[in-house]
């Protein structure tokens, strides 16, 4: 008991220590940014942190800020969730059918190797610009989810599966108690990787397609009018939204898996 308490305290102390170091690291790079801005003395080249924060607060309290955030958030997250669902389905299907895996392989290879800009320009011909970010986000996430889930299923411990077969454990219980826990690390890893990708690709699609009322439109206008503080402020907004959504989504997934395994 005493040993457990000491370990918990040590972990807490380490967590506090590293949290402090992370904060100092952020402050260090903000200071470098400020000094670089002061040295250049041209906001058009590098806006200072102070002007960016000021602009950020102006945006937050402006009328159409939340509309733009909502517009992009709904579409990019929709693309991500659709890719997750289809990626899991295709991975399970490919695991049970080699023919399906062979059929899917060329498509996954093409999507992986084709530049995002090429897809965006091609898709502008077929898809309205307001829905372009949905499809591009979906396209960038699908191969990552599919590949990781398929690999996770393949790496499931064969001895455990043989034991389940010997004791005649039905497929539903195998999925619940064996496959879910074995595949979860691969799924979480895929989500961490693809969440950043989907936001970068989705916003890039909006910058090129320029749908009205999107974050991409705001970035495009900031570039056209050489409004560097605006550009930095919207970039920070994208980073924060992406970070918060990632933490929330992964937390929900972990909670759902825990409930499934311990129900």
Q: Could you describe each region identified by the protein language model?
A:
Residues 109-144, 151-152:
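Generic hydrophobic transmembrane alpha-helix motif, especially the helices
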Residues 135, 139, 172-204, 233:
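Transmembrane alpha-helices
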Residues 98, 189, 233-263:
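C-terminal transmembrane helix and the adjacent membrane-cytosol boundary/short C-terminal tail
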Residues 78-108:
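Transmembrane-helix boundary motif in ABC transporter permease subunits
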Residues 1-27, 247-263:
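Transmembrane alpha-helical segments of polytopic membrane transport and secretion proteins
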């Amino acid at each position: 008991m005493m040993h457990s308490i000491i370990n918990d305290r040590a972990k807490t102390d380490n967590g506090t220590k590293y949290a402090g170091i992370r904060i100092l690291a952020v402050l260090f790079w903000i200071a470098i940014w400020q000094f670089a801005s002061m040295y250049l003395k041209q906001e058009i080249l590098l806006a200072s942190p102070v002007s960016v924060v000021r602009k950020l607060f102006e945006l937050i309290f402006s009328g159409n800020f939340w509309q733009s955030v909502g517009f992009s958030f709904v579409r990019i997250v929709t693309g991500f969730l659709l890719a997750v669902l289809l990626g899991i389905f295709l991975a399970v299907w490919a695991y049970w059918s080699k023919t399906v895996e062979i059929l899917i392989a060329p498509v996954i290879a093409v999507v992986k190797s084709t530049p995002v800009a090429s897809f965006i320009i091609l898709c502008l011909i077929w898809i309205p610009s307001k829905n372009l970010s949905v499809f591009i986000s979906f396209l960038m996430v699908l191969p990552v989810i599919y590949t990781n889930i398929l690999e996770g299923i393949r790496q499931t411990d064969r001895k455990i599966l043989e034991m389940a077969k010997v004791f005649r454990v039905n497929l539903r219980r195998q999925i619940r108690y064996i496959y879910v826990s074995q595949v979860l690390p691969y799924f979480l890893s895929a989500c961490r990787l693809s969440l950043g990708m989907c936001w970068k690709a989705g916003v890039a699609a909006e910058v090129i397609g320029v749908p009205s009322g999107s974050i991409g439109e705001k970035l495009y206008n900031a570039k056209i009018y050489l409004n560097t503080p605006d550009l930095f402020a919207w970039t920070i907004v994208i980073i924060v939204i992406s970070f918060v959504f990632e933490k929330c989504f992964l937390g929900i997934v972990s909670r759902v898996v825990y409930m499934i395994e311990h129900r």
